[in-house]
Each structure stands twice: as structure tokens, then as C-alpha cells.
A protein has these predicted regions:
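N-terminal interaction modules that seed assembly of large macromolecular complexes
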Residues: 2-62
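Helical mechanochemical/support elements of P-loop NTPase systems and associated helical scaffolds
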Residues: 9-13, 71-74, 102
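Ordered, amphipathic secondary-structure segments that act as subunit-interaction surfaces
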Residues: 41-97
Length: 167
């Protein structure tokens, strides 16, 4: 769900929502880093599968999700770039995992702040931020090449920080 704060919210907002909904796993990602709904679903699938296999990029799945959207293996960089800052007024995507009942309660709680998540085109920002060239997009045989490049880069993050399997 996309949240449009009516004033500066920052990390305190996320902490408050976590206190009101302790059974949910929550992470806020700057809307600029989420290309589309399918991009978000693919990144979440990567994190959930990594959690299942015990190969998260960080100790918590919430942090793993943020790192994959930010395309970095550094937690501090992910928080700085793709997280919500202490006085942020930017729209952010709130990723929530839990039971259907708890998710409905969260939706009701945040309903006045919800907005259209993909109203603006984030492709130019993402191409610039992650140095994705027109040539790379043209070389990708896909109906959504930018999305696939972003997801592929998020998937290989784990390979760059995990030790090789022992023989």
C-alpha cells in the first residue's frame, strides 16, 4: 500500500505502526525505488524465498527487502537511499506481511493516508540511480526489461556477500 503522509513522518511513523500492529512484519520503501506492482512482488518473492532457505542479506526479512530495492549489500546505504528519512514527506510503499485479518486492520488504520502507488513514472530515476543504459534495456528480451534488470540485480546481491558453498 502506498502512503502519502500529511506531514513529516520518518522512521518514527513506521515504529508507531509497528507498535500498533505487532503481529505484522512491516517495511517502508521510498516509492521512487518501486517501479511497479510486479516489481514489488518479484522482490518480495526473492526475500521470502531467501528467508525460507536461510540466506537473507541481513538478519531480518524487513531489512533484506529494503536492501534488495536499494540494490546494495550495505544496510546503512539501503536505509539512507530507499528508506524513509527522519523528516520525510515523500510517498512511500508500506510492505506488510502477516495474516489476512491483521492486514485488513492495518489497511483500515492507514486508509486516510493511502494514495495511488504508481501514479508517476519512476523509470528515469531508477535508470539514472542504478546506471542502467538504453543498450542494457535493448539487450533484455522481455516485455518489462527494466523491471527484469532490477530484479536480476537484486537476486545476485546475495551471491556477492555469501561465502561459496564448502566442497
Amino acid at each position: 500500500m502506498a502512503v502519502a503522509p500529511d506531514g513529516p513522518v520518518g522512521a518514527a511513523f513506521l515504529d508507531e505502526v509497528r507498535m500498533r500492529h505487532p503481529r505484522l512484519r512491516l517495511q517502508a520503501v521510498s516509492a521512487r525505488f518501486v517501479l511497479s506492482e510486479t516489481h514489488a512482488k518479484k522482490i518480495l518473492a526473492l526475500s521470502v524465498e531467501s528467508d525460507r532457505l536461510g540466506i537473507l542479506l541481513a538478519n531480518r526479512i524487513e531489512t533484506d527487502i529494503l536492501m534488495r530495492f536499494a540494490l546494495t549489500s550495505q544496510i546503512s546505504v539501503a536505509i539512507r537511499d530507499a528508506g524513509i528519512g527522519p523528516s520525510s514527506r515523500d510517498i512511500f510503499i508500506l510492505i506488510a506481511m502477516g495474516t489476512a485479518r491483521d492486514l485488513v486492520l492495518l489497511h483500515k488504520d492507514l486508509e486516510p493516508l493511502l494514495t495511488e502507488p504508481f501514479a508517476s513514472d519512476r523509470a528515469p530515476f531508477l535508470k539514472r540511480k542504478f546506471h542502467i543504459t538504453h543498450r542494457a534495456i535493448d539487450a533484455t528480451a522481455s516485455s518489462a526489461p527494466l523491471e527484469d534488470i532490477l530484479v536480476e540485480r537484486a537476486a545476485v546481491l546475495g551471491a556477492s556477500i555469501r561465502p561459496p558453498p564448502s566442497a
